[in-house]
């Protein structure tokens, strides 16, 4: 049984893409971790220096590094996971770069009713991963359908032009489907927070359990399950940890 589970985890393109994509995020996580450690180093003299006029520029620089890494986890996850998916899939072998581009556009279109830069933050990372996988799968399916009906090769033009023309319909349909899906959710629930369904569902779950020991144990369990699948569980459940 364990061998079957291991084989399934290794052969499933979604799990493989998440695992490989999150491995690619390690340099950014390390940068964000170091900047956070340096900013909060528990030495009074150092903290006084950062708060002074001379150290304010350094503090601003470290905060910029933190915001560009941990503060942009949703963006980094979507970019890296879709890149790993594009490299692994075998349906479209021309230009895998369309997968990251379409995934990012799909995520923005889905979350548009919420607006703002907060959609790239850690609280949206689970939602970003889900939308990335759905958009990559949808893009692959449309690529397969288009390839079965028509192959576009224009003689005498650049290779990237042909790749762009082949990706036109799949990209437009994928982004449109994600955008319409997000708009429907917004209209049904009349709440922009539903766009971040990852944090929304987790918050609804923990809201009924309160702030006692069961909530803490469940938080630890879900966090480790997410880590098992390669998802940064602590950042995904950041909205929950603020409530506990």
Where does each model-flagged region fall?
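Signature of multi-pass transmembrane helix bundles
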Residues: 1-29, 35-37, 53-54, 58-228
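Membrane-interface interhelical connector segments
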Residues: 43-55, 238-244
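Acidic, glycine-rich loop-and-beta core segments that form the ion-binding/anion-interacting portion
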Residues: 219-244
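Acidic/histidine-rich, metal-coordinating catalytic segments
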Residues: 40
